[in-house]
Amino acid sequence: MAVDTTTEAKAIARYIRMSPFKVRRVLDQIRGRSYREALIILEFMPYRACEPILKLLRSAVANAEHNQGLDPTTLVVSQAYADGGPSLRRYRPRAQGRAYQIRKPTCHITIAVAPQVEDN
């Protein structure tokens, strides 16, 4: 299966309030799959990370359709990755006047779709 990366369309979601490790677990399942297959997988996976990824995948396909005039039925998820964003720092009061730091991680998710090229 060859993918034409010259006509790649992508979408980026920034500052998603979720750990990048948890998001990567879901992205690994859809990378390299067709758009329709990825939609079905995301609909039925039990993870919280599926919701922003599903929204982002639909956005990437809409970008491909609107900006480059590509057919959604031929699209394949060519790239899918999550990078770490800035962590929100919160403090939890502890005994004897101490405070423990709580890190609330964020991530930036990128999904790119490209049309599948038929091998001759």
From Swiss-Prot:
PROSITE patterns noted in UniProt: RIBOSOMAL_L22
GO MF annotation terms: rRNA binding; structural constituent of ribosome
Gene Ontology CC: cytosolic large ribosomal subunit
Domain of life: Bacteria
Record-linked SUPFAM superfamilies: Ribosomal protein L22
Gene3D superfamilies: Ribosomal protein L22/L17 (3.90.470.10)
Keyword list, A-Z: Ribonucleoprotein, Ribosomal protein, RNA-binding, rRNA-binding
Gene Ontology biological process terms from the UniProt entry: translation
Quaternary assembly: Part of the 50S ribosomal subunit.
Family, as annotated: Belongs to the universal ribosomal protein uL22 family.
Function per UniProt: This protein binds specifically to 23S rRNA; its binding is stimulated by other ribosomal proteins, e.g. L4, L17, and L20. It is important during the early stages of 50S assembly. It makes multiple contacts with different domains of the 23S rRNA in the assembled 50S subunit and ribosome.
Protein name, as recorded: Large ribosomal subunit protein uL22
Source organism: Crocosphaera subtropica (strain ATCC 51142 / BH68) (Cyanothece sp. (strain ATCC 51142))
Gene, per the UniProt record: rplV
